[in-house]
Amino acid sequence: MKTLIALSYIFCLVLGQDLPGNGNSTATLCLGHHAVPNGTLVKTITDDQIEVTNATELVQNFSMDKICNNPHRILDGANCTLIDALLGDPHCDDFQNEKWDLFVERSKAFSNCYPYDVPDYTSLRSLIASSGTLEFINEDFNWTGVTQNGGSNACKRGPDSSFFSRLNWLYKSGNTYPMLNVTMPNSDNFDKLYIWGVHHPSTAREQTNLYVQASGKVTVSTKRSQQTIIPNIGSRPWVRGLSSRISIYWTIVKPGDILVINSNGNLIAPRGYFKMHTGRSSIMRSDAPIDTCSSECITPNGSIPNDKPFQNVNKITYGACPKYVKQNTLKLATGMRNIPEKQTRGIFGAIAGFIENGWEGMVDGWYGFRHQNSEGTGQAADLKSTQAAIDQINGKLNRVIEKTNEKFHQIEKEFSGVEGRIQDLEKYVEDTKIDLWSYNAELLVALENQHTIDLTDSEMNKLFEKTRRQLRENAEDMGNGCFKIYHKCDNACIESIRNGTYDHNEYRDEALNNRFQIKGVELKSGYKDWILWISFAISCFLLCVVLLGFIMWACQKGNIRCNICI
């Protein structure tokens, strides 16, 4: 019993000791940063996954499923390909003299005129697309001795047989087809594009019926180039009731140059020229609908916002677009390292500083103070250090966007079958570029995240050191981001520490006196906890012993009977 009384006395003495921050002559001031219950994982140079309070997604991985008609001028090809619109297919007459920033070709587009081929289809398509216009100027060519404006039932304009509106099909007049020699100088100050063709009859009889000669020849020349085409007579697969074909060619005539056309048959002559423009217009294959909205960046999937530096929607883009990368997600840290707050603070509910954990619920700043003094507890943010961190983090996203956004469009790459090896090489180069950009993007984001975390940690340390320099010997660093202040420090005193007007000399004598008095009797918190738990355990043990002794004594006296049945 004496032991029990002694342990109880020790327990009471321990509880009676003044705890840091609980007495009238001391106070506790802790520094900390805000935290959230569930942070965001980001990647840094040193860590694959580190939790931060805030992060911004840098990869745009979905489109609007529609193409915006602003600020770019979009021309919907509908049922027409760009080449059909160029040649003047009857069902594409609405496209004459049209202009565009982006010509959108649809999968439903079809040709509905004389069957033709373009030996270098992709180059012509790209040339017209980049010009951004179908502006056409008619010219008076002198085709003496032949019949003009040939037509076909395979190319109807309304109920009548017709032909491509930008081409002039020449055939014999009477029973003659003389040698044609026509010149057309370019006296203007811009490039002129002439489209012409060669007719390939399906039989020798068709050849002589149209052109008299058994074999024709077409030569088109400028000072810089010459093309000579001999028709290839023979049957081909039937298309719209015809087994003959037309091959389409083009010639660019520079200012001061001259166009010369020589032919003794099979010529599909130009009616004029297309005025060439230089610009950043382009063409894209897409079935996304065109709608009234605004977006700088367009992909075949639809328009996408360009407020992120990277995108994973499509390699092919037009406009000011995010850089294409392989990653579906890259997160940029825009907050500090997140250490969720511990819900329990030990047996006495003490406050803790940033070294132990962050503080949830601190919404008015990133860094701040918590205190316990004779007037109670309180919390306030430190706006200066918060603003210093925010100022350095703000603009990170914009700087990354500036470094990575495409200023030009990434066009479709197409090659003919003859250029298969070039196509393979181009694909390899494009894939390598994407791999490099994907790696660079990941490295760039990891570096920025490392910098953000280091700088936010640095601001916390700066605030802690600033507070330490103010308090000097008037307080003791408790090792957890808190200071034990050895003098009476009311709310006004705490506020002076926060705003940097604290005068340590004013409290120096009181602090030294209290420090010596408290140190003389204070048990270190670690030993105090041990004594508390040990005394509690022994007290419980002795209580059990006393209770068991009482039961045995009662059994001996007959006051308690215990029956054991088997």
Curated annotation (Swiss-Prot):
The chain crosses the membrane at residues 531-551. It is found in: Virion membrane; Host apical cell membrane. Disulfide bonds join 30-482, 68-293, 80-92, 113-155, 297-321, 489-493. GO terms for biological process: clathrin-dependent endocytosis of virus by host cell; fusion of virus membrane with host endosome membrane; fusion of virus membrane with host plasma membrane; viral budding from plasma membrane; virion attachment to host cell. GO terms for molecular function: host cell surface receptor binding. It holds the Pfam family Hemagglutinin. Residues 17-530 are extracellular. It is a single-pass type I membrane protein. Residues 1-16 form the signal peptide. A lipid is attached at residues 555, 562, 565 (S-palmitoyl cysteine). Keywords: Clathrin- and caveolin-independent endocytosis of virus by host, Clathrin-mediated endocytosis of virus by host, Disulfide bond, Fusion of virus membrane with host endosomal membrane, Fusion of virus membrane with host membrane, Glycoprotein, Hemagglutinin, Host cell membrane, Host membrane, Host-virus interaction, Lipoprotein, Membrane, Palmitate, Signal, Transmembrane, Transmembrane helix, Viral attachment to host cell, Viral envelope protein, Viral penetration into host cytoplasm, Virion, Virus endocytosis by host, Virus entry into host cell. One of its GO terms (cellular component) is membrane. Belongs to the influenza viruses hemagglutinin family. Major glycoprotein, comprises over 80% of the envelope proteins present in virus particle. This is Hemagglutinin. The lineage of its organism: Viruses, Riboviria, Orthornavirae, Negarnaviricota, Polyploviricotina.
